Amino acid sequence: MIPDVSQALSWLEAHPDALNGIGRGIERETLRVRPDGYLATTAHPTSLGAALTHKWITTDFAEALLEFITPVDRDIDRLLAFLRDIHRHTARELGEERMWPMSMPCRVERDGDIELAQYGSSNIGQMKTLYRQGLKNRYGALMQVISGVHYNFSLPLSFWQAWAGVNDAESGKEAISAGYLRLIRNYYRFGWVIPYLFGASPAICSSFLQGKESKLPFEHGDNGMLSLPYATSLRLSDLGYTNKSQSSLGIAFNNLPDYISGLKAAIKTPSEEFAAMGVKDKNGDWLQLNTNVLQIENELYAPIRPKRVTRSGEAPSDALQRGGIEYIEVRSLDINPFSPIGVDADQVRFLDLFLIWCALADAPDMDSAELACTRKNWNRVILEGRKPGQTIGIGCGKTERPLVDVGKALFRDLLRVAKTLDSQGGECQYQEVCERLAASFDDPDLTYSARFLRTLQDNGIEKTGMALAEQYRAQLREEPLQVLTEQRFHDEAQRSRQSQSEIEESDTLSLEAFLQGKS
């Protein structure tokens, strides 16, 4: 049903200090909205600094889509306090605008109302906007303003030294990369537990469909709300950001050279569909960066990514080739609407436990057929995860087991990991999280999606969203900073603006020549 990890867990219990120093970082996206709930049409506030170069506050797809980024931290409370400080400062700088507190956008009239993020006049700034122009023309802008939380996670070198026998990060990079790919394969097989527990997009505003038909059997509620009774995360469904043309790429996670070559091939693979669109329109305005399946590597849709911090101008795959996998990025978390900062400590601790389990459990190689099979399990959980009697396919559909049984078996293992982690700090926080979340398998009404759906059914999406946005705005604006200071925010905003100016002044090539050099 799940891999037998008893030996690995016994090893972990004998080496508890191997987990000292887990690295964590969080990226949280949120839309700026006006007091009437519509998407803000204002520019990114200059008081927040330059989105191109700011270390903590930037934008994602749209000018109104804020993205907050924490540095790597080894302390969960400090990590979340840092993220909350970014929210506190931003709430004070946004005037009357609010931060939308859920993943799915609501009051957007048309795709054309969504302004692409702007990054100034430098070649790299214009390239970032052109890439977004390509995303808009390929998939539609509305899909791109769905918000999520990304969790960055790295195991300490001490873990790899004890577990894989490496001496240091450089000489051991192949073993470390293989270890992270093992984690990723297990994540594809069992990561559906994340939307089961934490999915928080069981409903959408009907305006999100923009008049298009959907194959999903939505229930029509008041105020134009569409929902599925047992859904967990419509954000992760085909309504959200998935790329049909990518399904044939066959990017594998069995070893790093194959993963890198698959990624590099994807940005060179031509697409008939995108070629028909053209690179420029008849007026000579850019429509997309190129006509390949992926314009750049970041366009690859994935619920989890192997990562390494890139050097200036370096592609993600080149960074991986240079130094191996440094950390992984989990991309399956919906915005947590119950938290002013979109994520909470229970979620962070659960992800620690689950990702450690994924690193320890055996993970046979995965071919493209099995990768497609894992997607079926995810889809079941995304659309009908709380359905009574729901099953999960084990071993590419060879057997079906009740989701509840698989979840409980997993949590029995996670409790052992929790005890090991707690033994280091003399606390019970990980075990308490385990016990709280394990109850969601006996009672699906405890899941985030069930709790949130009840609220949405009572009050509708718009009313709920605006009430939470106003509540969190008032709360955050009043709270003092914990980790950062207003002076540090001021200095970083100033530094980012100066840095953008320097980049703009140092350009020597035309945009055309610059893009030619990138292809």
UniProtKB/Swiss-Prot annotation:
Gene Ontology cellular component list: cytosol
Q: What class of enzyme is it?
A: ligase
Q: What is its EC number?
A: 6.3.2.2
Task: Decide whether keyword Nucleotide-binding is in the record.
Answer: yes
* Highest taxon, organism lineage: Bacteria
Question: Which keywords fit this entry according to its UniProt record?
Answer: ATP-binding, Glutathione biosynthesis, Ligase, Nucleotide-binding
> To which pathway does this protein belong?
Sulfur metabolism; glutathione biosynthesis; glutathione from L-cysteine and L-glutamate: step 1/2
Looking up InterPro entries in the UniProt record yields: Gln_synth/guanido_kin_cat_dom, Glu_cys_ligase, Glut_cys_ligase
Q: Which GO terms describe its molecular function?
A: ATP binding; glutamate-cysteine ligase activity; metal ion binding
Question: Which catalytic reaction applies to this protein?
Answer: L-cysteine + L-glutamate + ATP = gamma-L-glutamyl-L-cysteine + ADP + phosphate + H(+)
One Pfam family of this protein, by short name?
Answer: Glu_cys_ligase
Q: Which GO terms describe its biological process?
A: glutathione biosynthetic process
Entry-linked NCBIfam families:
glu_cys_ligase
> What protein family does this chain belong to?
Belongs to the glutamate--cysteine ligase type 1 family. Type 1 subfamily.
Q: Which HAMAP family match?
A: Glu_cys_ligase (MF_00578)
Q: What is this protein called?
A: Glutamate--cysteine ligase
Q: Which organism is it from?
A: Erwinia tasmaniensis (strain DSM 17950 / CFBP 7177 / CIP 109463 / NCPPB 4357 / Et1/99)
Q: What is the lineage of its organism?
A: Bacteria, Pseudomonadati, Pseudomonadota, Gammaproteobacteria, Enterobacterales
